[in-house]
Amino acid sequence: MTLKNVKPDLDAAFKALEVYAEAKQHILRESTEITNETKASIGASISASTASDKKRQELLRDAETHAEKAGKILVQLQKRLKEDYGKFWRQDLISSAIFAIPEQEIVEAFALLSVLKQTEFPSRIINFRTQDPGSYLKTKTTLKVSNGAYIFGLLDCVGELSRVIEKSLDQPEFAVQTFTTMQELFGELERFTEFPNRKDPKMEKDRKSAGETESHPKAFSNLKHRIDVCRNQVLKCRKLLGNHTKLS
């Protein structure tokens, strides 16, 4: 008996796992940059909702710039993974929370920005522009995200819209308009309660970090829970607006 059939396959398996580990480390590094840019974008969008006209436009430009930077990093990351890892990189890596989270955050940032700018929501194929190195020109770029990242990113956007509404109660017309969009978006997402066990990567990561506690039960991160949270946010905003406007 010899190991001639074992060694080649074990060598190949070791190499595959080595490449996988390197790819995950690269994703982790880039994900931090994406998170920083999306947080900056969302923060600017939220601030724009209560700013005067001139300041509002300035903040929306900042929000767009940060969202575009995040998108550019992810496009470059996807390209790098395809080149280094191979054509099955998405199949093997997309289930990893560390990859799903940056996609989700980018959807959230671009979706919120679209509401504030009163433009169409982004599709799963997000169109944006990237700054050309050493130039003032921008190039049209597209980014495709996974189904899960798209759904959870839009659910996150519902949550951000509730923040916008709470800060905009002294602008009743804008607040009601934003609520109408929020309600319509949630109406499209509510059907996904049919798939209750899909996990929100961001919430799952938080749950694992906190440990299995009463405040972070196992169901905390599933899709049904996220939809229930958004439903409560819609109802809360409806009540708030009912107290401040003629919304019925």
Protein language model annotation of sequence segments:
Residues 1-85:
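Leu/Val/Ala/Ile-rich N-terminal alpha-helices, chiefly Sec-type signal peptides and the beginnings
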Residues 2-11, 107, 116-153, 193-200:
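Intrinsic, low-complexity N-terminal interaction/targeting segments
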Residues 139-181, 185, 189:
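Surface-exposed interaction/gating patches
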Residues 170-248:
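Long amphipathic all-alpha helical oligomerization modules
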